[in-house]
Amino acid sequence: MAKLLSFSDESRSALERGVDALADAVRVTIGPRGRNVVLEKKFGAPDIVNDGDSIAREIELDDPFENLGAKLMQQVASKTKDKAGDGTTTATVLAQAMVREGLRNTAAGASPVELRRGMEKAAAHIVAGLSERSQAIAGDAIRQVATVSSGGDEEVGRMIAEAMDKVSTDGVITVEESKSLATELEITEGMAFDRGYSSPYFVTDADRQVCEFDNPLILLTDRKISTITDLVPVLETVQKSGSPLLILSEEVEGEALATLVMNKSRGVLQVAAVRAPSFGERRKAALADIAILTGGTLISEDKAMTLDKVTLEDLGKARRVTISKENTTIVANDDHRQAVSERVSAIRRELEATESDYDREKLQERIAKLAGGVAVIKVGAPTETELKNRKLRIEDALNATRAAVEEGIVAGGGSTLLQLADSLDALASSLNGDQRTGVEIVQRALTAPIHQIATNAGQNGDVVIAGMRSSGQGFNALSGVYEDLMAAGIVDAAKVVRLAVQDSISIASLLITTEVVIADKPEPPAPAPAGDGDPMGGMGGMGGMGMPGMGGMGMPGMM
């Protein structure tokens, strides 16, 4: 494909226009009085969202060079989302401010490389400052973090705090759509483990990059599955039942994996494969635990059991399964509560008998996974659009709360960023030339989030920042008063703030050192069909579906 090239100031200006286009769409959502953004969908009703990452992913610009700038900003949002689960809008606002200041100084003759070094030194100083300011989360702080991260929704804050209290801060908490209008919390049997899908082609929700099944059947085996032949009988049986299928095994690879992916892509069968957790004998024990939880049978080599003899009765059942790139959560039915209780008792007896510290630790982990249960927040709303928006807010709040448990909390509302900006004075004074300018770029950018929070609340950002500095307190954008935000319960997760700063500095410092931009040359539009006839040419018939059962591919019963 032919390429387009852009050089020097022209290339950087195009990138900046792309950065601004995306950031201006995202920045309106920041703060408790942030606005919503409407996203058109190819099918169905438009989405109304308040989530920076969701907005950023939707943006694609006509100009190829500007689009590259937008794509770089999407990286800021997605990286922060992946690592912290929240803070995407803050990271985007910070990056935009740094890019603008950095390119202005570059155009004035500053060395981009020295600017970058100064910005990186500022980043290290900020990380250290955050660590000093963070406080361990305790008591009511969990509810406060969740409330702030959900846009001030007290009900969500209370519900997340209650969920963490019941299943512990390390427990499994999932968010799903409710069939009623109310948002409810339910504690049920379930388990989570750190294994994700074997192929990204199993994803059912492209926006969130997860695979979700309701009422799936679960095939459990300690075998490695390489060929599809052994699986054909059970796949045909599951297809007739109309249920999704999760395969938990030592590994699914080669021909078997390729065939499953193809059948999933063609809509023949809703299926996903996940490697079983742990290793060796511990893997078999983990699979046996899941079998008890789901009422299934472990198809084990030790018992000379084979996959081609599996029946529907051998498969486990769950209420819901959620699979991400790295984790799998099984929300079980309550049908097997007694069996789970007996299994936990048996593991406790093993725990009492063992003298190995390592074995003791692993047995305790198994007990925690089986007995801890799963907290399910069932989100309800009057309309589908509001339901999606509310679900996104709750997921963000849950992620931010987990981040707060990891690294503690700091004062929210942009006040900690303003304090960190003022603390950079000493670092800037110790440097000379363009490195000092690089620190000052970060220093000015750190005020951008509070400036935008104030603007979204109908206040003058410059006046609010001056008021915060003179009073030594934060600005509560909801009430419009200056107060101690930590005492008022307006707090942020330190991890979210740290990653927002680090990711924004990383992308901005790379962008201002850009000298050449290379983009794909847009292809000319396809010519319109000749004549006034049917542009589809009558479809020419479908020629049959070629899908008797799951036939095709030269294998009995498989596509």
UniProtKB/Swiss-Prot annotation:
ATP binds at T29, I30, G31, P32, D86, G87, T88, T89, T90, G413, N476, A477, L478, D492. GO terms for biological process: protein refolding. It is found in: Cytoplasm. GO terms for cellular component: cytoplasm. The keyword 4Fe-4S does not apply. Its EC number is 5.6.1.7. PROSITE patterns: CHAPERONINS_CPN60 (PS00296). Coiled coil: none annotated. It holds the Pfam family Cpn60_TCP1. Residues 521-541 are annotated as: Disordered. InterPro entries: Chaperonin_Cpn60_CS, Cpn60/GroEL, Cpn60/GroEL/TCP-1, GroEL-like_apical_dom_sf, GROEL-like_equatorial_sf, TCP-1-like_intermed_sf. It is an enzyme of class 5 (isomerase). Signal peptide: none annotated. One of its GO terms (molecular function) is ATP-dependent protein folding chaperone. It catalyses: ATP + H2O + a folded polypeptide = ADP + phosphate + an unfolded polypeptide. The keyword Transmembrane does not apply. Keywords: ATP-binding, Chaperone, Cytoplasm, Isomerase, Nucleotide-binding. Forms a cylinder of 14 subunits composed of two heptameric rings stacked back-to-back. Interacts with the co-chaperonin GroES. Together with its co-chaperonin GroES, plays an essential role in assisting protein folding. The GroEL-GroES system forms a nano-cage that allows encapsulation of the non-native substrate proteins and provides a physical environment optimized to promote and accelerate protein folding. Belongs to the chaperonin (HSP60) family. This is Chaperonin GroEL 1. It comes from Synechococcus sp. (strain CC9605). The lineage of its organism: Bacteria, Bacillati, Cyanobacteriota, Cyanophyceae, Synechococcales.
